């Protein structure tokens, strides 16, 4: 089981298509964490991506990090590795949620 708002190391695979994030990188879980699902929805992160209104910049492990809401993904739980490396606080998670809603037009 994963924790909503926790940042994990995630394997996004090696498929080289367009500008999609790939390889192992950090991502925050945005799907409900209280359910033992076989898939989880995450927002990948980057320390070098270009800024955008739907890419909030927050600190993860002391480093300014952009949350790539435009690359939100649902992946198998087996691709989430290890324990959380960090946790978003309530205000940080609200910024990610707002960016998701804005990006999806909700």
Swiss-Prot record:
Task: Kindly state which keywords UniProt assigns to this record, in alphabetical order.
Answer: Toxin-antitoxin system
GO BP annotation list: mRNA catabolic process; rRNA catabolic process
The protein's job, in short, is: Putative toxic component of a possible type II toxin-antitoxin (TA) system. Its toxic effect may be neutralized by cognate antitoxin Rv3098B/RVBD_3098B.
Question: Which Pfam families does UniProt cross-reference here?
Answer: PemK_toxin
Write out the coiled-coil annotation as residue ranges.
Answer: none
Record's keyword annotation contains Transcription: no
Matching InterPro entries: PemK-like (IPR003477), Plasmid_toxin/cell-grow_inhib (IPR011067)
Q: Which GO terms describe its molecular function?
A: DNA binding; RNA endonuclease activity
Question: Can you name this protein?
Answer: Putative toxin Rv3098A/RVBD_3098A
Q: Quaternary structure?
A: Forms a complex with cognate antitoxin Rv3098B/RVBD_3098B.
Organism, per UniProt? Mycobacterium tuberculosis (strain ATCC 25618 / H37Rv)
Q: What does the similarity note say?
A: Belongs to the PemK/MazF family.
Q: Does the record bear Lipoprotein in its keywords?
A: no
